[in-house]
Amino acid sequence: MESLKRFLCSIALLLISLLLPSSLAQQQQHESIRTMEDFSGYPIHEPGQFGSINLASSLSVDAPGLQNQIDELSSFSDAPSPSVTRVLYTDKDVSARRYVKNLMALAGLTVREDAVGNIFGKWDGLEPNLPAVATGSHIDAIPYSGKYDGVVGVLGAIEAINVLKRSGFKPKRSLEIILFTSEEPTRFGISCLGSRLLAGSKELAEALKTTVVDGQNVSFIEAARSAGYAEDKDDDLSSVFLKKGSYFAFLELHIEQGPILEDEGLDIGVVTAIAAPASLKVEFEGNGGHAGAVLMPYRNDAGLAAAELALAVEKHVLESESIDTVGTVGILELHPGAINSIPSKSHLEIDTRDIDEARRNTVIKKIQESANTIAKKRKVKLSEFKIVNQDPPALSDKLVIKKMAEAATELNLSHKMMISRAYHDSLFMARISPMGMIFIPCYKGYSHKPEEYSSPEDMANGVKVLSLTLAKLSLD
């Protein structure tokens, strides 16, 4: 029995002697890391501690909390639920902005606003002098739309920062969230107003200062001041402009607004390009008159001219023989708008887009030719044919695409490369920064309508990809 005890003691001593050097070495390594951290002022992470694979496994999204925030934000609306109407500089818009700024502050971000109400929330990195990595979207909503368009990219960005903070990640480059002013053209007829100004549009800044008014003849400056912005006494908006290279990269998380991801059962869309959009305003003037007293041969009907042009838009788009060419008559208004009065004036607003800029411009040219032909044929006056904007397409940056695709793969999420056919603030951010977009599925591709919906799971997947991509880019 004694011999057995001596044998077991010998084995125990041998095991202790083998394990002790490894334990001491690990302790010495930890002490060395702490010493280097104290000396440098920066965290020195152990190998793999914040490697992207390990970080991917530690990302935890508060999906119910994000959904609750989206629901709460949707209550700031001038339309009854489930519709959302949130127009630039209205009381509901101001309240919604206040709500988002509070969420940014709760996330520990430094919050600031510029002269037109672009809102910025920054998480300072370990090297704050480096250009930051930015992300964001918009929260304004066209009349009677849904609660996810743009909002997922703002509230999802705040949650992405919270996700990274909960994981223990420390960014090298600062991370900044941008809430863009007026991505929708609802009030002043200008899409992506805030991001256009950030990209340095002098023409827009001058127009906003001097000529731009809304449907009630309220000037942009008056409206901005009513919401607490544009306080410069000279109405100078150039302070909004950002220099090229202000950001290392810009990312936008967004619902797809189309059915492809849902139809194909995919989690993530990695956007490679944004289609080239253009918008037109057209007006015809006729002689009007009584609907019963003026016989058909004597009419110069501005309403029928508008109707004929609307059909011509469809015809010219289809003539391109490309699935990527689209055209929409989104507004058609008749004056005086009475059932027993022949329209004396008509107003159309036309949207046309394509991934091929030259092909889109050909469609615009044909629409203008048709407008002139219709005016002559119907003996009405083409009083306005105005190209409001005619923007080029934007390509996503190759490095940003690579990082987004890597993030999706490391998170075991299915993804595909795809084109964005809708307007986004990213189109203009691409003029000052490398850009990329992350799409998530939405129910039946619905958007700009109350049925717009993205599931908490799909939003959480998007937030994870955004978080991991931000982390990757912040360490570059």
From Swiss-Prot:
<keyword id="KW-0378">Hydrolase</keyword>
<feature type="binding site">
    <location>
        <begin position="183"/>
        <end position="184"/>
    </location>
    <ligand>
        <name>substrate</name>
    </ligand>
</feature>
<dbReference type="InterPro" id="IPR002933">
    <property type="entry name" value="Peptidase_M20"/>
</dbReference>
<comment type="subunit">
    <text>Homodimer.</text>
</comment>
<dbReference type="InterPro" id="IPR036264">
    <property type="entry name" value="Bact_exopeptidase_dim_dom"/>
</dbReference>
<keyword id="KW-0256">Endoplasmic reticulum</keyword>
<dbReference type="GO" id="GO:0006145">
    <property type="term" value="P:purine nucleobase catabolic process"/>
</dbReference>
<keyword id="KW-0659">Purine metabolism</keyword>
<keyword id="KW-0464">Manganese</keyword>
<dbReference type="GO" id="GO:0004848">
    <property type="term" value="F:ureidoglycolate hydrolase activity"/>
</dbReference>
<keyword id="KW-0732">Signal</keyword>
<feature type="site" description="Necessary for dimerization">
    <location>
        <position position="299"/>
    </location>
</feature>
<protein>
    <recommendedName>
        <fullName>Ureidoglycolate hydrolase</fullName>
        <ecNumber>3.5.1.116</ecNumber>
    </recommendedName>
</protein>
<feature type="binding site">
    <location>
        <position position="290"/>
    </location>
    <ligand>
        <name>substrate</name>
    </ligand>
</feature>
<feature type="signal peptide">
    <location>
        <begin position="1"/>
        <end position="25"/>
    </location>
</feature>
<feature type="region of interest" description="Involved in dimerization">
    <location>
        <begin position="276"/>
        <end position="391"/>
    </location>
</feature>
<dbReference type="Pfam" id="PF01546">
    <property type="entry name" value="Peptidase_M20"/>
</dbReference>
<dbReference type="GO" id="GO:0016813">
    <property type="term" value="F:hydrolase activity, acting on carbon-nitrogen (but not peptide) bonds, in linear amidines"/>
</dbReference>
<dbReference type="GO" id="GO:0009536">
    <property type="term" value="C:plastid"/>
</dbReference>
<feature type="binding site">
    <location>
        <position position="448"/>
    </location>
    <ligand>
        <name>substrate</name>
    </ligand>
</feature>
<feature type="binding site">
    <location>
        <position position="254"/>
    </location>
    <ligand>
        <name>Mn(2+) 1</name>
    </ligand>
</feature>
<comment type="similarity">
    <text>Belongs to the peptidase M20 family.</text>
</comment>
<feature type="binding site">
    <location>
        <position position="138"/>
    </location>
    <ligand>
        <name>Mn(2+) 1</name>
    </ligand>
</feature>
<dbReference type="GO" id="GO:0000256">
    <property type="term" value="P:allantoin catabolic process"/>
</dbReference>
<comment type="function">
    <text>Involved in the catabolism of purine nucleotides. Can use (S)-ureidoglycolate as substrate, but not (R)-ureidoglycolate or allantoate. The sequential activity of AAH, UGLYAH and UAH allows a complete purine breakdown without the intermediate generation of urea.</text>
</comment>
<dbReference type="GO" id="GO:0005783">
    <property type="term" value="C:endoplasmic reticulum"/>
</dbReference>
<keyword id="KW-0479">Metal-binding</keyword>
<dbReference type="GO" id="GO:0010136">
    <property type="term" value="P:ureide catabolic process"/>
</dbReference>
<dbReference type="InterPro" id="IPR010158">
    <property type="entry name" value="Amidase_Cbmase"/>
</dbReference>
<feature type="binding site">
    <location>
        <begin position="254"/>
        <end position="257"/>
    </location>
    <ligand>
        <name>substrate</name>
    </ligand>
</feature>
<feature type="binding site">
    <location>
        <position position="448"/>
    </location>
    <ligand>
        <name>Mn(2+) 2</name>
    </ligand>
</feature>
<feature type="binding site">
    <location>
        <position position="149"/>
    </location>
    <ligand>
        <name>Mn(2+) 1</name>
    </ligand>
</feature>
<feature type="binding site">
    <location>
        <begin position="423"/>
        <end position="424"/>
    </location>
    <ligand>
        <name>substrate</name>
    </ligand>
</feature>
<dbReference type="GO" id="GO:0030145">
    <property type="term" value="F:manganese ion binding"/>
</dbReference>
<comment type="pathway">
    <text>Nitrogen metabolism; (S)-allantoin degradation; glyoxylate from (S)-ureidoglycolate: step 1/1.</text>
</comment>
<feature type="binding site">
    <location>
        <position position="149"/>
    </location>
    <ligand>
        <name>Mn(2+) 2</name>
    </ligand>
</feature>
<feature type="binding site">
    <location>
        <position position="353"/>
    </location>
    <ligand>
        <name>substrate</name>
    </ligand>
</feature>
<feature type="binding site">
    <location>
        <position position="340"/>
    </location>
    <ligand>
        <name>substrate</name>
    </ligand>
</feature>
<feature type="binding site">
    <location>
        <position position="184"/>
    </location>
    <ligand>
        <name>Mn(2+) 2</name>
    </ligand>
</feature>
